[in-house]
């Protein structure tokens, strides 16, 4: 099962969060302006995007979002099965930093992400994802956000 989340590529090394928010908003047909999203998220080269700023930006742009920390893989699976792509914050082993991606599907014991850095249809096995479902400092665990409609 996979949802048609439009893929976008991040424009620099630190704006994966706003880029993922753009993907979600476009999926739901919510109008947005890329520059406004970057400004609302207060994204910066040194630290990227704060989870809460991402939530606030989504709400200011008209999306009703639900956030969960310390979530379970089953939460993501249930949301995907009910038609909701899920924005997640995870540790990207390829780049060694915290990263945002949009889970858009499930195939063969793997999550399929629309990932602004690693590409569209980027697979992460359930085991790998669960081991790395935290921010780069390990202060936020199993964080997810989705648009409630």
Question: What are the residue ranges of the model-derived segments?
Answer:
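Active-site-adjacent structural segments surrounding the nucleophilic cysteine of cysteine proteases
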Residues: 1-46, 92, 107-109, 148-149
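Extracytoplasmic/secreted envelope proteins and their assembly/folding machinery
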Residues: 18-22, 34, 38, 51, ...
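Sec-exported extracytoplasmic/periplasmic mature domains
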Residues: 25-30, 59, 63, 134
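Short loop/turn and capping residues at structural boundaries
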Residues: 36, 68-71, 90
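Noncatalytic regulatory segments and standalone regulatory/sensor domains
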Residues: 41-47, 62, 81, 85, ...
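Helix-adjacent hinge/juxtasegments
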Residues: 56-82
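Short beta-strand segments that buttress and anchor functional surface loops
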Residues: 87-93
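Short, surface-exposed coil-to-beta transition loops
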Residues: 96-101
